[in-house]
Amino acid sequence: MQGTEETEANRRNRISELPDCILLHIMSFLEARDVVRTCILSKRWKDLCKRLTTLAYIPSWDENSFKNIQSWVLSSRDQSCSLRNLTIDTRFLEGEEDLHTLVQYALFHNLQHLNIKINPSLTPKPELLPLILTSHSLTFHELSYRRGKAAVKSPILLKSLHLPALRTLHLEYVNFVATHDHYVDPFSNLRALNTLVLMFCALIEDALVLCISNQTLSSLTIFGVPSADEFLLSTPNLSSFTILGCPIFQQLLSSTCNLSFLQQVNIDGFSEGIGTASVFLSWLQVLANVKISKIGYSVIRALDYVSHSSILSLLLLIKTIIWILKYVRRCQCSL
């Protein structure tokens, strides 16, 4: 028994003897409350958590837990250390001021990755979004407002984004308003953007056309955005395009460029509705340069509900054969 206890003690000592960089890396996978608790383990751990550059807050039953974490960050964390990654899941009903203060602190400490999930019962301070949009350090931002079908009531309205270092943007349940002539064009000023994901977003007021205008964008995913009458692409470097859960037999797709770098298109999740096959045919024409196209069964099945379905099915079959032949030729040339 004594030998077992000594073995356990040695194991604990071995962990404590690891370099700070390794311990900090291990701690980056812990939830914020557990990170703070490590300070009571020993003198070796007392101040280690204060230099952690990654914090993730997951809600608990304790209503004061978020306030406590926010207070610890402001009062005890090493102010000379950058805070690179911050994840906040706000399932609590209150704490607008605490949320704003913590995000502000992080942005002033060279924050690069920001992931925020906001509870429907929580209304963030109006200053929160403009605060985020002034960041020159953010490279990744995910914002989920969790408004569900009530997204139209969301106070978060984005006209234009100005984050010079941002490479990945994920927006969920966010509203857009028109910038000019019924057009929504919020992404054209993101000079480093590579990946864009839009989920359950809405165009409100007089906005009708969603413009995805960006010179550097490579990957685009649109999921459940039925309020747009048209999607307009101005993305010369786009290589991957996924659209799911949209009424593509009713929504137009156009492009200002030939999308010559487009490698793969995924279309699925279509819900039946009134529309014409000619609309979807125009999609195929816009996406004519794609190398690989994956069209889900829901789209094929929907062809039975629209006019000229037999013609469209034939065109789709012919186009698929052409794609396959082109791919085989490229493979043969590479051998």
Segments predicted by a language model, with ranges:
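A structural signal for leucine-rich repeat
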Residues: 103-105, 128-136, 154-165, 182-192, ...
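LRR N-terminal entry segment and analogous cap-like coil->beta motifs
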Residues: 78-91, 112-119, 138-141, 263-268, ...
